[in-house]
Amino acid sequence: MVAIIVHGGAGTIRKEERIPKIIEGVREAVLTGWRELKKGSALDAVEEAVKVLEDNPLFNAGTGSVLTLDGKVEMDAAIMRGKTLDAGAVAGIWGVKNPISVARKVMEKTDHVLLIGEGAVKFARLMGFPEYDPTTEERRKQWEELRKKLLETGEIRHWKKLSELIKEYPEVLRSTVGAVAFDGEEIVAGTSTGGVFLKMFGRVGDTPIIGAGTYANEVAGASCTGLGEVAIKLSLAKTATDFVRLGLDAQAASEAAIRLATKYFGPDTMGIIMVDSNGNVGFAKNTKHMSYAFMKEGMKEPEAGV
């Protein structure tokens, strides 16, 4: 049974009037992925679904990525094939429109798994990806407002103070996008993010770390969203697939993974989506919101929500 699920990030959507547009965004992404999935390729389905989310400035990935402490965009992305365990990822990349597509090229055109920073940018250019500025006016304005507050308080160098201030913008603090699909033969997972607003320059989250934010094998695939450091410490995406190997379906495994995150790091930290090799989808969160949408065989329209 074929299936696909996408997410647009876990956290709190502060401006609730945005919720209908966010739901429409994940719905559009899953429908795009579903069309590719019906052609037979989970890999294409995941890439195209994530690209739709990267191109939507409502989400913190690709266009609309949040800015670092020094006002730059540094994006992370990863994609993984469950049948072969092939994977590709980029971290701290800038100047490209769709990091998920660069990650796929890393997987298909190199012997490596992860390229970072300037090396990832150079590779993207070699692969024909043109220069692109993903910064939006809204993100720049938010960055300027927060930076002004930091300068006024004299706390610009203190990360704990930054953590307190960015709670004023929870809708971008933990926003990540991802997709997981099963085409009847293979499970593929992909994730993309702009990271944490006002993050330290050079900071890398869970998204491009295989096993932490993104993972797929022959039994299940997972894409995580939330506080990246939590997913890294728990190897959460891989752990979730291990739950499936032990006998849980995708939904039960998703819930078990979030219980684990909550046990060690408390509520309001993580969200996850999954698909297993029986075509079951799963999603869970310990945050107020996590936008999601899914389609599987027998459904005429996607289910979507926050």
UniProtKB/Swiss-Prot annotation:
InterPro entries found in the cross-reference section: Ntn_hydrolases_N, Peptidase_T2
Record's catalysed reaction(s): L-asparagine + H2O = L-aspartate + NH4(+)
Record GO terms (molecular function): asparaginase activity; peptidase activity
Residue numbers annotated as active site: 176
Domain of life: Archaea
GO BP term, pick one: proteolysis
Keywords annotated in UniProt: Autocatalytic cleavage, Hydrolase, Protease
List of residues binding substrate: 203-206, 225-228
Sites annotated Cleavage: 175-176
EC assignment: 3.5.1.1
GO CC term, one of those recorded: cytoplasm
PTM annotation, UniProt: Autocleaved. Generates the alpha and beta subunits. The N-terminal residue of the beta subunit is thought to be responsible for the nucleophile hydrolase activity.
Family: Belongs to the Ntn-hydrolase family.
Subunit structure: Heterotetramer of two alpha and two beta chains arranged as a dimer of alpha/beta heterodimers.
Free-text function comment from the UniProt entry: Catalyzes the hydrolysis of L-asparagine into L-aspartate and ammonia.
Name recorded for this polypeptide: Plant-type L-asparaginase
Organism of provenance: Pyrococcus furiosus (strain ATCC 43587 / DSM 3638 / JCM 8422 / Vc1)
